[in-house]
Amino acid sequence: MELRVGNRYRLGRKIGSGSFGDIYLGTDIAAGEEVAIKLECVKTKHPQLHIESKIYKMMQGGVGIPTIRWCGAEGDYNVMVMELLGPSLEDLFNFCSRKFSLKTVLLLADQMISRIEYIHSKNFIHRDVKPDNFLMGLGKKGNLVYIIDFGLAKKYRDARTHQHIPYRENKNLTGTARYASINTHLGIEQSRRDDLESLGYVLMYFNLGSLPWQGLKAATKRQKYERISEKKMSTPIEVLCKGYPSEFATYLNFCRSLRFDDKPDYSYLRQLFRNLFHRQGFSYDYVFDWNMLKFGASRAADDAERERRDREERLRHSRNPATRGLPSTASGRLRGTQEVAPPTPLTPTSHTANTSPRPVSGMERERKVSMRLHRGAPVNISSSDLTGRQDTSRMSTSQIPGRVASSGLQSVVHR
């Protein structure tokens, strides 16, 4: 018995969660390709997936926008089938011991600004800019940054007249508190400036490893958000960015200086970081930190394997008094046999390019990520899978995610 959607896509295991609904690994039966399938129960109090799928369709054709394969309803679920992507920047950040080099941060910043600019050009703001919502591509697109999850996106201007939405206050926080702009904390309607300010906090998060307002304790979520807001507003940008190139402070100051309906100068912000990139003498080779770690891990595995074989060889000779003290080739000739090296066990580096390891837990979480980075591994692992924790700082007044139960897919079953 297998589960199918759209009479073409085979439903596999759960691989993550979006702002509304759960994400599953799937297979395009006709093409033999793996895909991502997002499901949302139609009985959810505030269905959002059909809205998100419409936004994705409006975004189609943009660089770093996932391709949508199919949208529709199947039984008790709204379904969206989309291109399968690689690990998120949060996954990769954990893999790199929660610290990115300046080069990697600048390479990412360039693409991330462009993704946000493209969304804004399509008359929408994202409203949940965070590392989990930027994924790397797979295979030939392994160096391309994608932006995902439009569950909280909102139209900020009329597509025909470009009339901007009105300024409003007393709005509830929508998005993730850790990266929310100060104006969002103050209850001001979000606009283009807020997406970019959130990106500034993401970049400093990559630089620092954590932000000053992380880990704050409070009795309720509301009080926690208030503490985050107070800490964020009381931390001067120059203090937040101390020890790092001034361009990061310049970026954040620029974002905070924008008025509600201002169009940001995206080219200026990109050039700010590109000039820094060139002054540092970096090369646009798109070698990120995780690529270097992957290479280092492969080389270390090879060295360890050679050392193991040498150790076994020495032990074998030490147990044979007739050959003790003789080189391995000589001992082989004395026995009238050829010297045969012991078989090499499989290591993570010996997998084929499109093989994905099964998820593991506990002490092997980091190993799970390292084995799948840029090998064409199809699984999009969420940061909560890696850390065993969930980010509870995300809040939207209408967010009531639907959970998928296997028993609820009866109408999707094909025998």
UniProtKB/Swiss-Prot annotation:
GO cellular component: actin cytoskeleton; centrosome; ciliary basal body; cilium; cytoplasm; cytosol; endoplasmic reticulum-Golgi intermediate compartment membrane; Golgi apparatus
Protein kinase domain span: 9-277
UniProt-annotated stretches for the region Autoinhibitory: 317-342
Region listing for Disordered, in residue ranges: 301-415
UniProt feature, compositional bias: Basic and acidic residues: 301-315
Keywords per UniProt: ATP-binding, Biological rhythms, Cell membrane, Cytoplasm, Cytoskeleton, Disease variant, Golgi apparatus, Kinase, Membrane, Methylation, Nucleotide-binding, Nucleus, Phosphoprotein, Serine/threonine-protein kinase, Transferase, Wnt signaling pathway
SMART domains for this protein: S_TKc
UniProt record similarity statement: Belongs to the protein kinase superfamily. CK1 Ser/Thr protein kinase family. Casein kinase I subfamily.
Record's disease association: Advanced sleep phase syndrome, familial, 2: An autosomal dominant disorder characterized by very early sleep onset and offset. Individuals are 'morning larks' with a 4 hours advance of the sleep, temperature and melatonin rhythms.
PTM-bearing positions, type Phosphoserine: 328, 331, 370, 382-384, 407, 411
The organism of origin for this protein: Homo sapiens (Human)
InterPro entries: CK1_Ser-Thr_kinase, Kinase-like_dom_sf, Prot_kinase_dom, Protein_kinase_ATP_BS, Ser/Thr_kinase_AS
Note: May be involved in Alzheimer disease by phosphorylating MAPT/TAU.
This protein's name: Casein kinase I isoform delta
PTM entry text: Autophosphorylated on serine and threonine residues; this autophosphorylation represses activity. Reactivated by phosphatase-mediated dephosphorylation. May be dephosphorylated by PP1.
EC number: 2.7.11.1, 2.7.11.26
